[in-house]
From Swiss-Prot:
Active site: 151
Keywords for this protein: Amino-acid biosynthesis, Arginine biosynthesis, Cytoplasm, Lysine biosynthesis, NADP, Oxidoreductase
Record protein name field: Putative [LysW]-L-2-aminoadipate/[LysW]-L-glutamate phosphate reductase
Record bears the keyword Amino-acid biosynthesis: yes
Catalytic activity, reaction form: [amino-group carrier protein]-C-terminal-N-(1-carboxy-5-oxopentan-1-yl)-L-glutamine + phosphate + NADP(+) = [amino-group carrier protein]-C-terminal-N-(1-carboxy-5-phosphooxy-5-oxopentan-1-yl)-L-glutamine + NADPH + H(+); [amino-group carrier protein]-C-terminal-gamma-(L-glutamyl-5-semialdehyde)-L-glutamate + phosphate + NADP(+) = [amino-group carrier protein]-C-terminal-gamma-(5-phospho-L-glutamyl)-L-glutamate + NADPH + H(+)
Family, per entry: Belongs to the NAGSA dehydrogenase family. Type 1 subfamily. LysY sub-subfamily.
Gene3D superfamilies registered for this protein in UniProt: Dihydrodipicolinate Reductase, domain 2 (3.30.360.10), NAD(P)-binding Rossmann-like Domain (3.40.50.720)
Organism: Pyrobaculum neutrophilum (strain DSM 2338 / JCM 9278 / NBRC 100436 / V24Sta) (Thermoproteus neutrophilus)
Length: 352
């Protein structure tokens, strides 16, 4: 039984970590922290957990965290870096849901996250494992510092990874269009995340130089064995949960459909969570956010456009589960030797 502490447990990702870990047979959640709600029952902030836990929020301190074997950091970007060195040195396993240890290049934090100087712990950057089990499984086994991938980066990488691995990304940078629900803005969003502004909306934000580009390019370049650049634009849409990504890959020669199936099946055929969705019949012939919600499932798919020598790829995920807390638990399971789907066997909710 692993004792777990969640630092920053009052937000959406913290609440999802609690929901998933409370059903994990190998975990005891011994602390959940929040400065704002210190002393309050967890279910007062996360009403869906009423009747499932009597845990109260405590002040976030290193001493509280060290009562656990494993710490999940659900903190804003730029905050985890203050915690990780002390926790890592103490021998506690750390699963960081922020971006603070995702990028291997210390200078990338200046460019993509506007840090005033390069990452102060380049040695820990190299030790951190990028927590995408389908692509980093061997590295995750026994890992003590795991950087959980970003939500839109997760969908983008997983839909394009088979093409990167098998040399099918071409010389033209792939174009990725992403759509994300309002929960992606967190529990304390800005004025444009209020209901009056968000309802009926379909709007781009950070249409160029979005920070998730750094992760996407890092991981696709690793798979391709060369530098890969990506054109990425996200859009806020009128849903609460979910991310849908569409990728456009332009090639000199289009692969056969049978080869495309081989690429995707070779990478994901044994996956517990990734489903390849490309059907000729049924009501959902390609990935659809509606059919992954509440789960750690990733639906990926593709279509071929011979007129333009274009491969169109798709991915659908729940941004709070597979895009954050679910992927963190999945990586935790692989690192700690639990069944990969322990605590993650929720079937997607439909209709919703």
């Amino acid at each position: 039984m692993k004792k777990v502490c969640i630092i920053g447990a009052s937000g959406f990702t913290g609440g999802e970590l609690l929901r998933l870990l409370l059903s994990h047979s190998g975990v005891e959640v011994v602390c959940a922290t929040s400065r704002k709600f210190k002393g309050e029952f967890v279910y007062r902030v996360h009403p869906n957990l009423r009747g499932f836990t009597q845990l109260k929020f405590v002040e976030p301190t290193i001493d509280a965290a060290l009562k656990a074997d494993v710490v999940f950091l659900a903190l804003p970007h730029g905050e985890s870096v203050k915690w990780v060195p002390k926790l890592y040195e103490s021998g506690v396993a750390v699963f960081d849901l922020s971006a603070d240890f995702r990028l291997k290049d210390p200078n990338a934090y200046v460019e993509w996250y506007k840090w005033p100087q390069p990452h102060p712990y380049p040695d820990l950057l190299q030790k951190a494992v990028y927590g995408q089990p389908e692509l980093h499984r061997d590295e995750l086994v026994g890992a003590k510092l795991v950087a959980v991938p970003g939500c839109m980066a997760t969908a983008s990488i997983l839909m394009l990874a088979p093409l990167a691995k098998y040399g099918q990304l071409g010389e033209v940078p792939p174009v990725v269009d992403a759509k994300i629900g309002s929960s992606g803005a967190g529990a304390e969003g800005s004025i444009v995340d209020l209901h009056s502004y968000r309802t009926y909306v379909v709007r781009p934000y950070e249409p160029v130089h979005h920070r998730h580009i750094a992760e996407i390019e890092q991981e696709l370049s690793r798979l391709a064995g060369r530098r890969v650049r990506v054109a990425f634009t996200p859009h806020a849409v009128d849903i609460v949960r979910g991310i849908f990504t569409t990728g456009h890959v332009y090639l000199d020669k289009l692969p056969a459909e049978a080869d495309m199936w081989k690429y995707y099946r070779s990478m994901y055929g044994d996956s517990k969570f990734i489903r390849i969705v490309k059907d000729r019949l049924g009501i959902s012939r390609y990935p659809n956010v509606k059919y992954v919600l509440g789960s750690n499932v990733v639906d990926v798919g593709f279509e071929l456009d011979p007129r333009l020598n274009r491969v169109v790829t798709f991915a659908a995920i729940d941004n709070l589960v597979r895009g954050a807390s679910g992927q963190a638990v999945q990586a935790f399971n692989v690192a700690m030797g639990f069944p990969e789907d322990e605590g993650l066997r929720q079937i997607p909710v439909a209709p919703i």
